[in-house]
């Protein structure tokens, strides 16, 4: 307006003598001023309002209601789309929120997923500038929904807080998207032969409950299933290795059904069982070997140590079985605990054998000493602690070596002779000769060596073979 005012009150117009000219210029000036003010107001509105709002038509709530009413008018939600014409194709997609915990006792696992299904329903096509209708769960029961169910589910819960966690979208071309959030307790049959070094593939199977293959076909929308960050999952004893999906057809008396399956590969973590079972068992076995270094005459000490280690192994075996179902086969942990129990029990039996023969030796030695004393009293010049051995009809005295005699009625050639003075046979000749007094010395070498070899075979066999 500044330039217009300057022009209006310029000396040129003031000197003009024509009132008509002045009036025309005045009206023109006022008209141009109004146009400029309107242009400024429109520029201010463009700064605060999205420019597309001017181009796009405004959609009112009544228009959406009218579209829904027209779609549902005459719509029968009991009939699937394209019934009698072609199968309805259901594209499925799964987003895994979390997996766990895994319950090995009941052989099941818990999974939290968002399950999505997409299909086309020509009855839901509409003409509107709005391409998609975003609806809540109230619309779900008014249109046809696939009767999908999870085949290996023991318990399934839909989430309802704060509202039902369901979503429904309808596109103008008739495409329908239906998603919902589910928490499922699914069966997972665990093969525990290698427990606790076992690996498992837990399936999640779903299919149509009533529509066979010629009515409904399931397809994966994406080649792989998306998952959330596994580090927040409550797997505890297990580690998530990966997953894979597959499609198969099962044959039943009611028809052929398409089954969609997701396999979750899990590997068990050994940390818990190493601390709770393996290390205590190994330490208990090593503790039982302390008995070999205790004097054989310390009966209470060695007996109490052996019984304590046996009872400890029994307790460890019972605790180890509590984390397992009652399977009829032997697991890797059962084998390890059983062998450890055998080693501990063998250490106790070793002292029992040693104590028995040592006591027997002392009794026979005392009897022999009495006989020698009686003979010595009858034979002049014979040392009381010696025996007579006939050589060419000559009796020669020999120091007693406190040996054992073979049991009466036994053949020394065929009996594993553990006695010092086995009279005949190859045992007496020195091929195999075991001294009872040195059983502890033999055990100090045999038990650790045998247990080390067992551990080598056990861990290599289960971890690498």
UniProtKB/Swiss-Prot annotation:
<keyword id="KW-0812">Transmembrane</keyword>
<protein>
    <recommendedName>
        <fullName>Gamma-aminobutyric acid receptor subunit gamma-1</fullName>
    </recommendedName>
</protein>
<feature type="topological domain" description="Extracellular">
    <location>
        <begin position="321"/>
        <end position="328"/>
    </location>
</feature>
<feature type="glycosylation site" description="N-linked (GlcNAc...) asparagine">
    <location>
        <position position="127"/>
    </location>
</feature>
<dbReference type="GO" id="GO:0098794">
    <property type="term" value="C:postsynapse"/>
</dbReference>
<dbReference type="InterPro" id="IPR006202">
    <property type="entry name" value="Neur_chan_lig-bd"/>
</dbReference>
<dbReference type="InterPro" id="IPR005438">
    <property type="entry name" value="GABBAg1_rcpt"/>
</dbReference>
<keyword id="KW-0406">Ion transport</keyword>
<feature type="signal peptide">
    <location>
        <begin position="1"/>
        <end position="35"/>
    </location>
</feature>
<feature type="transmembrane region" description="Helical">
    <location>
        <begin position="274"/>
        <end position="294"/>
    </location>
</feature>
<dbReference type="InterPro" id="IPR038050">
    <property type="entry name" value="Neuro_actylchol_rec"/>
</dbReference>
<feature type="topological domain" description="Extracellular">
    <location>
        <begin position="36"/>
        <end position="273"/>
    </location>
</feature>
<dbReference type="GO" id="GO:1904862">
    <property type="term" value="P:inhibitory synapse assembly"/>
</dbReference>
<keyword id="KW-0325">Glycoprotein</keyword>
<feature type="topological domain" description="Cytoplasmic">
    <location>
        <begin position="295"/>
        <end position="300"/>
    </location>
</feature>
<feature type="topological domain" description="Cytoplasmic">
    <location>
        <begin position="350"/>
        <end position="444"/>
    </location>
</feature>
<dbReference type="GO" id="GO:0050811">
    <property type="term" value="F:GABA receptor binding"/>
</dbReference>
<keyword id="KW-0770">Synapse</keyword>
<keyword id="KW-0732">Signal</keyword>
<keyword id="KW-1015">Disulfide bond</keyword>
<keyword id="KW-1003">Cell membrane</keyword>
<dbReference type="GO" id="GO:0004890">
    <property type="term" value="F:GABA-A receptor activity"/>
</dbReference>
<dbReference type="GO" id="GO:0022851">
    <property type="term" value="F:GABA-gated chloride ion channel activity"/>
</dbReference>
<dbReference type="InterPro" id="IPR006028">
    <property type="entry name" value="GABAA/Glycine_rcpt"/>
</dbReference>
<comment type="function">
    <text>Gamma subunit of the heteropentameric ligand-gated chloride channel gated by gamma-aminobutyric acid (GABA), a major inhibitory neurotransmitter in the brain. GABA-gated chloride channels, also named GABA(A) receptors (GABAAR), consist of five subunits arranged around a central pore and contain GABA active binding site(s) located at the alpha and beta subunit interface(s). When activated by GABA, GABAARs selectively allow the flow of chloride anions across the cell membrane down their electrochemical gradient.</text>
</comment>
<dbReference type="InterPro" id="IPR005437">
    <property type="entry name" value="GABRG-1/4"/>
</dbReference>
<keyword id="KW-0407">Ion channel</keyword>
<comment type="similarity">
    <text>Belongs to the ligand-gated ion channel (TC 1.A.9) family. Gamma-aminobutyric acid receptor (TC 1.A.9.5) subfamily. GABRG1 sub-subfamily.</text>
</comment>
<keyword id="KW-1133">Transmembrane helix</keyword>
<dbReference type="GO" id="GO:0007214">
    <property type="term" value="P:gamma-aminobutyric acid signaling pathway"/>
</dbReference>
<feature type="glycosylation site" description="N-linked (GlcNAc...) asparagine">
    <location>
        <position position="245"/>
    </location>
</feature>
<keyword id="KW-0813">Transport</keyword>
<dbReference type="GO" id="GO:0051932">
    <property type="term" value="P:synaptic transmission, GABAergic"/>
</dbReference>
<keyword id="KW-0868">Chloride</keyword>
<feature type="transmembrane region" description="Helical">
    <location>
        <begin position="329"/>
        <end position="349"/>
    </location>
</feature>
<dbReference type="Pfam" id="PF02932">
    <property type="entry name" value="Neur_chan_memb"/>
</dbReference>
<dbReference type="InterPro" id="IPR036719">
    <property type="entry name" value="Neuro-gated_channel_TM_sf"/>
</dbReference>
<feature type="transmembrane region" description="Helical">
    <location>
        <begin position="445"/>
        <end position="465"/>
    </location>
</feature>
<keyword id="KW-0628">Postsynaptic cell membrane</keyword>
<dbReference type="GO" id="GO:0032590">
    <property type="term" value="C:dendrite membrane"/>
</dbReference>
<feature type="glycosylation site" description="N-linked (GlcNAc...) asparagine">
    <location>
        <position position="50"/>
    </location>
</feature>
<dbReference type="InterPro" id="IPR036734">
    <property type="entry name" value="Neur_chan_lig-bd_sf"/>
</dbReference>
